[in-house]
Amino acid sequence: KATIKPQSVKDVFVRMLTLYAGMADVLAQTGDKSLQPALDSIWNNIVDMRMHITGGLGAIHGIEGFGPEYVLPNKDAYNETCAAVGNVMFNYRMFLTKKDARYVDVAEVALYNNVLAGVNLDGNKFFYVNPLEADARNAFNQGLKGRSPWFGTACCPSNIARLIPQIPGMMYAHTDNDIYCTFYAGTSTVVPLSDGKVTIKQTTNYPFDESVRF
């Protein structure tokens, strides 16, 4: 019952984002509209008052939690990689409930600017913490000045490994009669609609080139 009427987000961001994503799943699967006002309130509070420009979430180090509204520091931001993963998952599920592009816009921001920044190109070193400002002198990343090959609490590497393989399955969504492109990437797929199957091919070098061709 405590989840039905929240006005703002509190507590540990990863735990809360997982709860909110689950609420959105319940709404999408059951059509329980009693959850919608709470989810809308939560989403607006996060995006309007607590999200960094990178899609990162969480200003409080000690509890790995959401800070006060509009407290969005650069150097001292926490922005845990797990929270960015949760931001993608929550917003994708919100999109499935409403088919509103603003949700996948936020998911895209978090994916490109926070999730993917949490791992190096070789895939073997990680950020736990993602501040917006780093000077190579402050050991901001769990005692390190840069990415780490592992952590004592290794939730972030495993959450990246959990999300990335799901992205191909999140590229498109559909109803009986409508197809939605949720992320831009070079892809091809076959979408089953009520009147038959539709083959889609998307050609793009996004985000390095904003040209997208279907």
Give, region by region, the residue ranges found by the protein language model.
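Glycan-recognition and catalytic cores of secretory/periplasmic carbohydrate-active enzymes
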Residues: K1-F214
